[in-house]
Amino acid sequence: LPDIQEPLFSNLHGEKTPCVIMAAYGNRHYDDTLAQMQYRLEEQGFICIGAIAPVIPHIYSDILGKGRPDEKDIRIIRKFAVEIKKRLETGEQYGFASVKVPGNPLPAPKQMKPVEKSFDRARCTKCQVCVQRCPVNAISQETLQIREDRCLNCMSCVKVCKAGARGYDCSQVADYLEKNYS
């Protein structure tokens, strides 16, 4: 998980509250994400009764995860949902048990590789949808500039910009991922 996730978890509070964790990823690997989420949520009073990591299209590549989730994935997700429903029903009666997930809950921080971003002020309509949709508040409401120290390179701002004012050059990252993971 990015090291800027602190407010997300510190603002959540459970009292032995059951939860389900999910790490959707673009057919490369989700690394330690499930273990990190479980650790942080259980620190906040939750019990992780289920975890799933479905494959979705990769944000940087049109090849990785293309067509996912597919019918087989949907069947697996539905089966998982049925299992979670059963765990919730029996857990209310007998108590909830935490699941074991793969990964290191406290890995060494990884350096984010910056992705070259573009912002065309002439095309920008100043609608501020990018500001509102940025999951980590990395876009200044006043200047509309991206704070690199906060940006996850998730491309959410690019996806929601109807004017086409925002862009990312992720070709080098996509090339690497496609060569090594497709």
Task: Give, region by region, the residue ranges found by the protein language model.
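FMN-binding flavodoxin-like domain, especially the glycine-rich phosphate-binding loop
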Residues: L1-P114, D169-Q172, Y176
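Short, surface-exposed acidic/glycine-rich loop or hinge patches that mediate macromolecular interfaces
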Residues: A24-N27, C124, C151
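Reductase modules of NAD(P)H-dependent flavoproteins
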Residues: G95-V99, Q111-A122, K126, V131-Q132
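Iron-sulfur cluster-binding cysteine motifs and their immediate structural context
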Residues: F119, T125-I146, L152, S156-V173
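Active-site-proximal loop/hinge segments that shape catalytic or ion-binding/gating pockets
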Residues: E178-S182
